[in-house]
Amino acid sequence: MAFKTLDDLLAEGVSGRHVLVRSDFNVPLDDEGNITDSGRITASLPTIKALIEGGAKVILSAHLGRPKGEVNPKYSLAPVAEALSEALDQYVALAGDVSGEDAHERANGLNDGDVLLLENVRFDPRETSKDEAERGTFADELVALAADNGAFVSDGFGVVHRAQASVYDVAKRLPAYAGKLVQKEVETLAAVAEKPEHPYVVVLGGAKVSDKLGVIEALAGKADKVIIGGGMCYTLLAAQGYNVQDSLLQEDQIDNCKELLERFGDKIVLPVDLVAATEFDAQAENKVVALDGIPEGWQSLDIGPESVKKFDEVIASSKTVFWNGPMGVFEMEAFSKGTAGVAQSIIDATAKNGSFTVVGGGDSAASVRLLGLDEEGFSHISTGGGASLEFLEGKELPGVKVLEA
């Protein structure tokens, strides 16, 4: 993929220039508005620091949550501005709006090396509009903030699969460059997508099988084995004839799953035991059961210990591993062992086998941090869940494609 990078921009010189950066600051917050996982902020720092050192007037844009196109204080980027100020050891101002009067005044008042964070771009309904002309008017307003010989740096890999104003349309209006994070993500995932070393093992989890049928199909054609756990495995087990009781089940997908198993049954690896509970609750009574042993009215919330062993045997022989999605409800300690076990197997494969191991962002990356696992134990932890999946599936990512123009 041929696109200009931050290094190219720095070589051209950024001193005194406005540089608009699309970052990914979609971080989880607790009820008090405190950031509970700052991984995405940390991942954005190399690009921001390089621009500060180059003397750029840095304007950061990002979204947080789903405010549905209207201003909602719950989704303000104020906690992010505070976290950035601390991480960069310099004040990061938060604009009082996205592209309005306050944003313009602050952007015009920036000195070389200053950083301004715009308020949540999704406070404006045009950001996510399906109408290109509508998005374009918003993109024009964002571009107008970069009045001093402006440039655009795309550094939010978690959003490059979206054709949104601050990701896609802005890149068509300014000289556009891939930031350090986007460059690293694309190069790493391209290595997995184009020339994975075999055996190549894909580990998929998460809630809905309907969201990942296309992914399973695409990756099963390239991988040697596809391990499936998490909520999505119950519809596949039902397709094999098991009664999954009250476990998460998409009945309308059973026929699709049957077809998938017929085509790729030799590659798909499913759990052999489960952890069932009386209800979806951290304190619920629970026990390890066989696939056909879920008590009536109970639901499975994790894979069992024999499944972890079975999956470990497959992962242990790998040379490339891509993992996206937890094996169970990892946020609840009683149902976190499957995810922790599989993650540890991947870490072991990295260390003992020299396997190239990639964690595909989203809940998988969050689980690594929440469970206190060694982040350095993986070859790469992606910041983009949906983006990394779509990339490996072979789909075109609008926010990357536009950089090649």
Swiss-Prot record:
Q: What Gene Ontology terms describe what this protein does at the molecular function level?
A: ADP binding; ATP binding; phosphoglycerate kinase activity
Q: Name one Pfam family in it.
A: PGK
| Main enzyme class | transferase
Per UniProt, where does substrate bind?
24-26, 40, 63-66, 122, 162
Please give the biological process terms from Gene Ontology that the record holds: gluconeogenesis; glycolytic process
Does this UniProt record's set of keywords contain Ligase? no
Subcellular location per UniProt equals: Cytoplasm
Show the GO cellular component annotation of the record.
Answer: cytosol
Q: In which pathway does it act?
A: Carbohydrate degradation; glycolysis; pyruvate from D-glyceraldehyde 3-phosphate: step 2/5
Gene3D superfamilies associated with the record: Phosphoglycerate kinase, N-terminal domain
- Catalytic activity, reaction form: (2R)-3-phosphoglycerate + ATP = (2R)-3-phospho-glyceroyl phosphate + ADP
Q: Could you say which EC number(s) this protein's record lists?
A: 2.7.2.3
Q: Which UniProt keywords apply?
A: ATP-binding, Cytoplasm, Glycolysis, Kinase, Nucleotide-binding, Transferase
Write out the residues that bind ATP: 212, 331, 361-364
| Subunit annotation | Monomer.
Give the similarity note: Belongs to the phosphoglycerate kinase family.
Q: What is the protein name for this chain? A: Phosphoglycerate kinase
Gene source species? Corynebacterium aurimucosum (strain ATCC 700975 / DSM 44827 / CIP 107346 / CN-1) (Corynebacterium nigricans)
